Amino acid sequence: MTEQFNKKIIGDCTLYNADCEEVMPLISSVDAVVTDPPYGMRFVSNYRKEKYKEIENDNGFKFLKWATTIKAKHSTYVFCRWDNLYQVIKPNSLITWVKNNWSMGDLNHEHARQTEVCLFYKGKNHFFPKKRPTDVIFCNRTNNNYHPTEKPLQLISSIVEWTNGVVFDPFMGSGTTGVACAKLGKKFIGVELDPNYFQIACQRIEKAYQEPDLFVSPPTEIKQEVMEL
């Protein structure tokens, strides 16, 4: 049976509304991966379940193991929960995000968490384009609420700045990684299964190119295609 999915090109960003496992064979290679895969938690918190619907394909941390095997030539950055650290391939280092404006978080856990972790895997061609960065990032939580596990643009931009070449996010969500790439003048490939979040991502990335404070040119044309597998 032939399956179809949407492909949209906005500037240097190529976006797919599809399952990442279907798109991966179509991508020859990437330089870097920056992603926040499903946590296997069904909802963002037990405190306000009614605010968000369930996350598509949020069915366990097999996705994290898969994401770390992507052949990124430069680097791979994967956000994860602390209790999933022992289920994954050993990273080269661990980056800690300290939330300046932390909250009570998931009430099922003993402590209110002020931090989240990001795993770093070094590719064979890895180097830092600027000075060697620290392994701690201090950044406020986002107030946008486009997605239940959305990361702040400042946080993702800090990590994207450490990459070179084409950046890939197989779990794009509401498109924060793509927005960061648009702002920083980097090429981006993103995949999102949920059509609603995909549309939000497209709108945010298009807007990022149009904002006057950016040093990259706006896209001359937005292309949309329907691809068959």
Describe each PLM feature range:
Residues 214, 228-229:
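Replication-associated primase and helicase/ATPase modules
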Residues 57, 204-205, 221-228:
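Short amphipathic alpha-helical patches
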Residues 2-3, 8-10, 202-217:
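Short, conserved SAM-binding/catalytic segment
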Residues 4-189, 194-199:
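Core catalytic lobe of class I
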Residues 17-22, 218-227:
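Conserved SAM/SAH-binding loop
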